[in-house]
Structures are given as C-alpha cells and as structure tokens.
Amino acid sequence: KGLFESNAIEIIEITKLGEENGDKTVAVDSFEDNNLVFIDEGHRGSSGDKWKINRDKLSENGFAFEYSATFAQAINAAGTKKKELENEYTKAIIFDYSYKYFYNDGYGKDYSILNLSEDSDEIKQTYLTASLLSFYQQMKIYESSKGMIKPYLIEKPLMVFVGSSVNAVRTESKKQVSDVVDVLLFIDEFIKSKSESIANIDKIMSFDSGLQTTKGVDIFENKFSFLETTKLNASQLFDDMLNLIFNASNGTLHIENLKGVDGEIALRIGENEYFGVINVGDSDKLVKICEANGMSIASRDFSSSLFKTINDTTSNLNILVGSKKFSEGW
C-alpha cells in the first residue's frame, strides 16, 4: 500500500542477468542507472568475471554496498589483479568486521580441518566413523539442552557432505565412483558391518584410532568429552547412532530416485523414515553408479520436494549431500 501500491516487485536470479535481453536473460542495461545495489558474499566474482562486470554496471551511477568476511583472503588469491583490487577496496571500507572479529564475537562456526596423509579404505572408514560420531555428539548435546538453547534459536544439527560437483566421476578398480558414492558406501558399510563399526568406535573413543598428529597424539583426543559423560560403551553408542541419525535399529541402506521431483535422491534404512537426501543435477546417472557399486536402488513416485522439508521442525532428515553451494546455506 501507499508508495508502492501500483508497482509490482519483480524478483530474478542473478544468473539471468546478461548483456542482451533474451528468453531467459535480462539485459543489465534494462535497469535504470540510479541503482542501490546490495551484494552479499561480495568476494565472489571480485577477480573480474562476468558477475563482477554486471554488478559494476548496475551501480555505475548509483551506489553499491558489499558484504564479505573474507575480502582480504580473496584479494590475496587474486594473482595479477591483487594490486588493482587493493586500490579499489581499501579506499571504500566503511566498517572492518572481517572473519576474526565476528568469530571472536561468537558469530562464526567452530571448525576442525584434519588433513590425512593417506586415504586407504581402512583409514577412510575410521575417519568417516569419527565424523559421524562427532555429528552424533552434536545431536546428543542438542537433545539434552533444548530448553537451555531455545532462546538462542539454535536449529537441530544437520550433517552436510559437499563437493565441487555431486556427479564428478572417477574410475577405481575398473568401477565408476565419486565422492558421493564414497559417502554412501561408507554409510552402507557402517550399518551392515556392525562388529567392525563397533570396533572402530571403540578405538576412536579410546584415542587409539591409529591416526596421529606430528607430535604422536591421537587426532581425536579430547574431541568427544560429552559422549564420555554418557558412560555408553561402543556397542551402545552404535545402537543409539542408528536410532538417532538413521531412524533405524538395523537394516540395509536403500537409495531411492524420487520421480516427479527434479534431482533428488532419498536415503533410508529398510522401510524406516528417510534420514537423508541427495540434491543432484542428474539423479539418474548417480543412481546407476550406485547400482554398479552393488547398492540397493529403487525409484519411487514423489509429488513434492523432500529437500524443501529439511528445515521443518518435524523433519527426520539428518544428512544432506550436495554441491558446495550448500556450504553457505539455502
């Protein structure tokens, strides 16, 4: 009502901006030139690609506000354009609230980067089991602290596996595999090989994983202090992980291509509730690779997106697999 009563608000994706008007593009020159442009994650495209050129055109005779916690890192990685970008941005900083400042104020994510010197199947299984154990610990803390953390609007934990391309395929032992298939093979192995999984959990919780820092300290030492307070043994931890993460007590991993929904694959154990979803461009291709690697696959008619329910308070989805775009939310 009022000022904008007769003006419709049109929303378009930035990928639809182009040099000329077309069936699927809108020319940048179509916009009036007195524009106020807000740019989140402004470091993206700062090296001079098409998006940078378009946004500069949009604000050429207007004003642009750019936000990013990692401008400095992006500029340092800009190669030959580093000096040019320094000259452009250093004279235009309104407020320096880069990553180290907002992290110290409590807004950043805690992270742990553990680079492995080798990636044998045994080491990968141990490492991914520890990752799953870490996620399980987060879920247990969330479940036990709901009342206390409610005022802070903290959502239920979600485990996210991201890659540069969900369908990036390589050949190993004459079979096509991918990072996504590796994750699914791990989950399948973790569930069906109960005794091996329990043994891995026991080694991790005993700080005897076989993975050590350069100083000879187990890399998982002091990582599971909350789980230690539960006094659960490795077998009990395994059973509770199946229940809390996979919505099951036992069974086989089922990979279901959701027909009627573009690019979604659902994950479940047996006939239990779905515990995960894969968001991928070519779901048929990925399902075929899974089948070639001996996994249980099926197609199921599905009328609505499973992925879009992931933020629902009643959602049973605990694992998301997708491209690196999900590392910044959705």
Which sequence ranges carry the predicted segments?
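Conserved C-terminal RecA-like helicase domain
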Residues: 1-9, 144-320
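Mechanochemical coupling/switch segment within NTP-driven translocation systems
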Residues: 3-21
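Signature of the SF2 helicase/ATPase Hel1-core->accessory helical subdomain module
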Residues: 15-150, 157-159, 308, 323-330
